Amino acid sequence: MSKGIIAILVGPEYEDLEVWYPKLRLEEAGYDAPLVGIGDASYRGKWGYPATVDRQVGDMDAASLAGVLAPGGWAPDKLRRDPAVLSLVRTVHDQGGLVATICHGPWILISAGIVRGRTLTSTVGIRDDVVNAGAHWVDQPTVTDGNIVSARVPKDLPAFGAAMVQFLASHEP
C-alpha cells in the first residue's frame, strides 16, 4: 500500500538524474511517484533519457497529493508558464505538502509565488532569480524550510533524497 503520491513534474529537456534518482528514492520509501507533464506523452531529458508521462497536470487532484517535485534542467522554464502547474504547486504548498525542488526547479516555485521570505538553495545560475523573488539563498547541498525542500545540483541528490524522505516521514498521518 502506498504512503501517498508525490507528483514529479517533467517537460522537455528535464535534467535526467534529477528526475530518476528522486523517483526511485521516493518509490523505495513507499510512495507513488508518477511523472506529470503538460502536453506530450513523453519527453527527452537533457542527456537523452526518455520520460513517459503517467498523468497530465490538469488531471491531478492537488488535495490527493503528499507532495510535488520540481526537478531542474530546462523543463522548469517551460513548466512555469503553465497556469495548471503553478496552481498545483501553490495548492500543495498551501496544504502543507512536500514541495521539493533542485537545480533550476525553483523557477517554478518563484512563478507560483511561494518563495518570498523562505530560505532555499538552487544551482548558482538562478541565485539572483531566487533572491529577486524575495527568498534567502544559501549555498548548501540541501535546505529544508517549512515544507520546501531544496537542493543545488545532481551531486547533492543523496542528501536531497534523504531530506525529502525525512520530511515525509515526519508528516505521515
Located regions from the model:
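Catalytic nucleophile serine of serine hydrolases
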Residues: 103
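Extended, subdomain-level signal for the structured scaffold at the beginning of enzyme domains
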Residues: 1-99, 108-119, 127-173
